[in-house]
Amino acid sequence: MNKLTFFFPGQGSQSVGMMAGFGGSKVIRDTFAEASDILGVDFWKMATETNESINETTNTQPIMLIAGVATWRAWQVVASDVPSILAGHSLGEYTALVVSGGLSFADSLPLVRYRAKVMQNAVPAGVGAMAAILGLDDDTVRAVCAESALNDVLEAVNFNSPGQIVIAGNKAAVERGMELAKIKGAKRALPLPVSVPSHCALMKPAALKLAEYLKDVTITTPQIPVIHNADVASYDNADKIKDALVRQLYSPVRWVETVQAVYTQGITQAAECGPGKVLAGLTKRIVAELPCVAMTSNEALLELQGVLQTN
């Protein structure tokens, strides 16, 4: 087993120009063209020209998956090293499944667009919210949520790094939670610019629809294990993988535990396979001893290749 893991980012890492570091790479362009043909949307234009549509969740989810798969394919052109374990943050879990061979690229695109649609439709505009709480431990944030929920939904939903936790639920409850978090000593409590309160109980109606859709999606045993967000475990059974994807919609993203689990399996090099450097930054805060390269350019791919050759 080699000592390499790839992490795949989710929503929030998208930006116009996010693939610029790859120049006019043929494999990148071809991957975007393939996806555009499947969904009937010009995703390359969306990724390269100034627009707001890249931030609409029904576009963001597919384009982040496309970008991650394109980066993976660009890696395959320059190197033969295959990671021994994969993980993705929220939407990134789907990208990881594609790279693992458990889900086809062609099937993944309409699947994540459908996921985005049912998430968007599960909660009327203005009803849900999310906020980042900085500087409190996990148990304190959970207690803040329990105390602030009253008759609403309010949950700790993303455990991103020690002291960086995202809460989600009904907007009024999130606002109460932010105020109480500050009283409890949070360094900051920041509302997030999202319209969908992901990974909380408000997503259960969406999860039921996703489960129905997944019945007709072919999933096979991944060739590379994928650690799932909902329970920090990997599966080789299609039904268990589908169940993990469904539960993920209304369960917390246990990212701290995920990175720790990867590290305890003997991984010595991580890479963030997709746009941005969010997961690379989180990795450093979770396990300082685990270096993580952000694969955002041709140069970064060569840097990673060089690191692997010298180790």
Feature locations, PLM:
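Short hydrophobic/charged patches on amphipathic alpha-helices used for structural packing
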Residues: 256-260
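Short, solvent-exposed amphipathic alpha-helical segments in soluble enzyme
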Residues: 23-24, 147-149, 182-184, 285-288, ...
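Alpha/beta catalytic cores of group-transfer enzymes, especially the acyltransferase/condensing modules
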Residues: 11-13, 100-251
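Conserved functional loop/turn residues at catalytic and ligand-binding sites
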Residues: 90, 218, 266
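Short, low-complexity, intrinsically disordered N-terminal peptides in bacterial proteins
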Residues: 1-3, 310-311
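FabD-like malonyl-/acyl-CoA
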Residues: 2-141, 192, 269-299
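Non-catalytic positions within long, well-ordered alpha-helices that form the structural scaffold/packing
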Residues: 182, 263-266
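Short, flexible loop segments at boundaries between secondary-structure elements
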Residues: 231, 291-311
